[in-house]
Amino acid sequence: MLDALSKAAQLQRQAAAKGFDWPELDGVWAKVREELNELEQAGDDTAARYEELGDLLFAIVNLARHLKVEPTDAMIAANAKFERRFAYVEDAMAAACKTLCAENLAAMDAAWDQAKAEERERA
């Protein structure tokens, strides 16, 4: 059984093979923006948010396909990046004798930005 991202990519490849696809990348980007806007417009309607978030994720997977990026691999990499950066935040907060809580969000954000900067320097 395929994970949801892989299933979405498979469905989109099958549709594209039958000609149901955006001919230009601009159309894919426009669809992503459209779905994001619809999610924003869903407001407090839980059912609408659920549906529109699914549509946005589906559109993002289609964008990944057009960009020739495997969405599951990209998500795995994003998860790993988040884990590295959040571990940095935790260490920085501990070194500063600060707790991880909403009241210290500015300090956590600063540590996050530092983690990003250090990753860029190493790249």
Predicted regions and their residues:
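Flexible "arm" and connector segments at domain edges
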Residues: M1-L53, L57-A123
